[in-house]
């Protein structure tokens, strides 16, 4: 079962200021831990004036159709590729479940701030219950993205 989710946010800081915070390991860790991560590590793969690539490894409690399972832990890896010239972030998630998650986020300057357009593609490779899982994942993005953008703005305000 495949599904897409898209949202736009108007932010009170420049695209560069927001991008700098979205790449900040402290923000990445805070964001992941706000969603229940037990351990978070960020490893740079490549960084120059044109692009920045890194992996985010997260250890969290297991998840199933009924929710969190504290008797087991799961590891997931998100590979992030920034095109710094276009302020575009592309990411791919891989984990313990038959789920493919990819996304693209684009920052543009607008007025005295910026706009962040976020999108994710969800593909659940589970027969029968895949539709339910995809719906829960989509709802998770819709619930968490506003919280994430608020956190990014809080981090940007500390730097201003």
Task: Report each predicted region and the residues it spans.
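Intrinsic-disorder/low-complexity, polar/charged segments enriched in Ser/Thr/Lys/Arg/Asp/Glu/Gln
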Residues: 2-8, 51-53, 75-77, 88, ...
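A generic structural micro-feature
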Residues: 1, 48, 68-74, 95-99, ...
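Acidic, low-complexity intrinsically disordered segments
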Residues: 141-151
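Glycine-rich portal/gate segments that line the openings of hydrophobic small-molecule binding cavities
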Residues: 41-92
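Amphipathic hydrophobic-ligand
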Residues: 34-37, 69-76, 97-104, 137-138
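Short, highly charged C-terminal tails/helix-capping segments
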Residues: 150-160
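Beta-strand/loop substructures that line and gate deep hydrophobic ligand-binding cavities in soluble
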Residues: 81, 90-139
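Hydrophobic ligand-binding cavity/cleft-lining segments
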Residues: 1-60
